[in-house]
Design a protein with these regions (language model features):
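Conserved N-terminal segment of class I S-adenosyl-L-methionine
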Residues: 1-102, 106-110, 123, 227-234
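Feature marks short, surface-exposed loop/turn motifs that line or immediately flank catalytic pockets
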Residues: 94, 144-146, 185
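A short His-aromatic
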Residues: 111-115
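A short glycine-rich, Lys/Arg-flanked "PGG" loop and its adjoining helix->strand segment in the class I
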Residues: 120-135
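Short, glycine-/aromatic-enriched active-site segment of Class I SAM-dependent methyltransferases
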Residues: 136-158, 162-170
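Conserved S-adenosyl-L-methionine
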Residues: 174-184
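A C-terminal cap/extension of S-adenosyl-L-methionine-dependent methyltransferases
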Residues: 186-241
Length: 241
């Protein structure tokens, strides 16, 4: 996570699917074909995605501002693993990497951008860190209509639209390779539980239902719809010319 975010519960890997084994196959299926061998991950959480990237043969620079999570990432890897952990927010990390003239062929940002107030600056920094032809891979919550108390409680500044992503890419000089919705079946449960009933937190039971029922079914439906219609999340693949 980066910048304006809530600590406490956000450090609990059981609450956020992208840091769990349940959600990892989804992320890998969405991004595998676009990954390079030199990856910068912004908001690496507990390191589950970084661990997968290393297994795929990538060199990983994992950025994580929360000390407890940064320690978890370091604990996952042996001294010989091709991983560097930067304990900083995205602004500090990008500045340090720029000072080293360090660039990447992939910048990965999963469920982080929605926590950042100045998302245009975030896009610009990511673009500057990419080599020509490099990819910026982003996964965020979609549909401002769904914005609710749970978004505020977990530090979400916004939920995204395709239009906003196109604007951000233009501003940063990036080309949109693909922009698709994900998780159409998650819309109704989210709307009922968090928007209408105004539940203030994510429970272990709801996480279990989400991981074991909604997420797998959504993945199947999304394969048919190919992210064209609507979904609870947005997935961006952008390219630096």
């Amino acid at each position: 996570m980066t910048e304006a975010h809530v600590v406490g519960s956000l450090a609990d890997e059981d609450k956020y699917f992208y840091n769990e084994e349940h959600g990892l196959p989804i992320i890998t299926s969405l991004f595998r074909g676009h990954l390079g061998r030199d990856v910068l991950e912004i908001g690496a959480g507990t390191g589950t995605i970084a661990e997968w990237l290393v297994r795929e043969g990538a060199h990983v620079t994992a950025v994580e501002p929360e000390p407890i999570l940064a320690r978890k990432i370091r604990a996952k890897f042996a001294a010989g693993d091709d991983v560097r952990v930067i304990e900083a927010d995205s602004v500090g990390a990008y500045a340090a990497l720029a000072a080293e003239a360090r660039t990447f062929d992939t910048v990965l940002c999963v469920s982080v951008l929605e926590h950042i107030a100045d998302d245009a600056r975030e896009f610009a920094m990511a673009a500057a860190a990419l080599r020509p032809g490099g990819r910026y891979l982003v996964f965020v919550p979609a549909m401002p209509l769904l914005y609710s108390r749970i978004d505020r409680e977990t530090g979400h500044v916004r939920r995204y639209t395709k239009r906003r992503f196109r604007e951000l890419c233009r501003g940063a000089g990036l080309e949109v390779v693909s922009l698709r919705y994900f998780e159409v079946l998650g819309i109704l449960p989210y709307l009922v539980v968090y928007k209408l009933l105004r539940r203030p937190s994510i429970t272990s039971s709801s996480t279990g239902v989400y991981n074991n029922v909604i997420l797998p079914l959504s993945a199947l439906v999304d394969k048919v719809l190919r992210g064209r219609l609507i979904g609870k999340n947005l997935v961006l693949v952008a390219r630096k010319p």
